């Protein structure tokens, strides 16, 4: 890429980052926005269906139903449920790995840095164990056991984690989730052609997935991460490109599998690694 796409493509509140992107000799997602500015009107409205080999079907005033008979409401809800199930699956995958990492650390009797977070979860789950590592393993097992329940068996930790009045409303609405992994499978299956045409029913499934994703994929992932990474502390810190310190080796890590970073957290402070950094020109501490 020899020139910038346009003067507004990379506009950002972070001016150093904006200038950096504008001068890159390659294409970034910021530049590709320009080429994708014209959107498919059917796709934007959610009334395009590509679920079966008879499609794609698009809903218009002259053709209000797809070949399978689904109307706009069904197609929109079906597309939405598939997207929600897919996203939920990603987050449940993360909390599963995080719980397994906590369990592995407990079994090795090392790597527990946030005992306060561990004690908080143990109290919530009503786990009483003197040994910290046994306590951590049982906390991890409680999370994993819930994830692996069948769809028709409600997860046990939801009530312990949720705000009580809200839990009562979920119970009245019939949207308490079963096993989180099974709920993802159930949601995908429900989207199949001719299996369900009730948009309200599919949207209720989205709410169930939202509960399991929020409590397990988000809240519990963070609390389990605190056990192995240590509990976070509020502090003032630079953001954007200002985090880069030219006196040191700068490594940027991104992703959701934070508990997998614990190895790097330890390894990068070892003497042989710090010596290599000094040899590369990093400032000695």
Mark where each language-model region is.
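Metallocofactor- and cofactor-centric catalytic cores in central/energy metabolism, strongly enriched
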Residues: 2-285
């Amino acid at each position: 890429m020899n020139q910038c796409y346009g003067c507004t493509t990379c506009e950002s509140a972070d001016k150093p980052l904006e200038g950096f992107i504008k001068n890159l000799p390659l294409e970034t997602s910021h530049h590709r926005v320009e080429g994708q500015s014209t959107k498919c009107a059917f796709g934007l409205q959610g009334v395009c269906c590509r679920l079966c080999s008879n499609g794609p079907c698009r809903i218009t005033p002259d053709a209000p139903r797809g070949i399978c008979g689904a109307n706009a409401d069904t197609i929109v809800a079906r597309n939405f449920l598939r997207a929600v199930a897919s996203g939920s699956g990603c987050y449940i995958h993360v909390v599963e790995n995080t719980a397994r990492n906590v369990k592995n650390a407990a079994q090795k009797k090392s790597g527990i840095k946030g005992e306060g977070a561990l004690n908080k979860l143990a109290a919530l789950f009503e786990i009483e164990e003197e040994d910290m590592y046994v306590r951590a393993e049982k906390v991890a097992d409680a999370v994993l056991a819930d994830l692996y329940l069948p769809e028709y068996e409600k997860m046990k930790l939801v009530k312990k984690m949720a705000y009580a009045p809200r839990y009562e409303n979920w119970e009245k609405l019939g949207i308490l989730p079963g096993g989180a992994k099974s709920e993802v499978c159930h949601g995908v299956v429900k989207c199949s052609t001719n299996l369900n045409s009730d948009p309200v029913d599919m949207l209720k499934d989205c709410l169930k997935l939202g509960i399991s994703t929020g409590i397990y994929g988000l809240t519990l992932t963070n609390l389990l991460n605190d056990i192995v990474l240590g509990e976070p502390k509020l502090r003032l810190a630079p953001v954007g490109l200002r985090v880069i310190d030219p006196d040191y080796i700068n490594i940027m890590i991104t992703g959701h599998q934070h508990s997998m970073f614990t190895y790097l957290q330890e390894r990068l402070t070892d003497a042989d690694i710090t010596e290599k950094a000094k040899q590369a020109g990093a400032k000695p501490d």
